[in-house]
Amino acid sequence: MISAADIFCLVVGVLGLGIGALRTVFRDRFGAIYPTILAYSLGLAVLVRSPGIGDIVLDDALYHLTGKHNLPDLLGHLLTFVAMGAALGFFSRALGYRHRLWRTYGVIAVLMAVIVALFLDSPAPDVRTENIVQIDGLRAYAAMFSFALIITHIFGLVISRHGRMAVGWAPEIIALYAGTCGGIAMAAHRLLAVGFPQFYDWGYSPITWCLSLVCIGGYVTAVWVMSVTQARENSGPGGIADKGAHGVLERAH
């Protein structure tokens, strides 16, 4: 039986992949590559983490190919960082954040490598489950994943602060703060559940889902508002086509 979570993941996943495909086909019109990567990675991450498609269908398929369980969970976790990296790149460019992000991307890449190593060294590949965080012996993996999420969202918080100082409390800045703070709260809640297993009995999944929706909704809304603003400025005389890529920042001057 298809659950509500499966329907939600299917709708959001297909929507993300569809938006990514449209941006790829009409790339000359949209220009920026970061939202395209964000759409693809977020859509795939939601699909592979869905209870029915990811934990059952895809897990069985990958198990027959590789002999390892829970690869969809690992893939979904890694795609989360790809989506975050794309979002950070877009926000830094749109808000005129002058510091290069290669150090940030390097830190994220190292954290992803550690996560993969901890997964392969854990019992997760040999045990089929719907939530790998609950597997005995996987606390190190769960803790590292949550810690990596917090670090990544803190990078987003730094860019959010830069944007607030540049343009004030504009709608996209409010949405960006909602995304970063929601992400930090979600990761902190996951980290608490690792240290205190009783959190699983106190509505862990609903709380995690709600905080995840706040995080995703905030980031997606910020990207959408900034993209619309840039498109409007680019279509008019003296827009970002003439002034440069930092369309959102132009409003502060």
Kindly give the residue locations of the regions a language model identified:
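C-terminal transmembrane-bundle signature of multipass membrane proteins
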Residues: 148-253
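Membrane-interfacial loop-to-transmembrane alpha-helix junctions, especially the N-terminal start
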Residues: 27-41, 99-107, 166-176, 208
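Juxtamembrane "helix-exit" motif on the non-cytosolic side of transmembrane helices
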Residues: 54-60, 120-132, 189-198
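Individual alpha-helical transmembrane segments in multi-pass integral membrane proteins
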Residues: 3-14, 35-48, 60-93
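First transmembrane helix
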Residues: 1-31, 145-162, 220-225
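Extracellular-loop-to-transmembrane junctions of the mid-late helices
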Residues: 125-159
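The cytoplasmic-loop to transmembrane-helix boundary for the fourth helix
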Residues: 92-122
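Hydrophobic alpha-helical transmembrane segments of multi-pass membrane proteins
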Residues: 34-59, 173-193
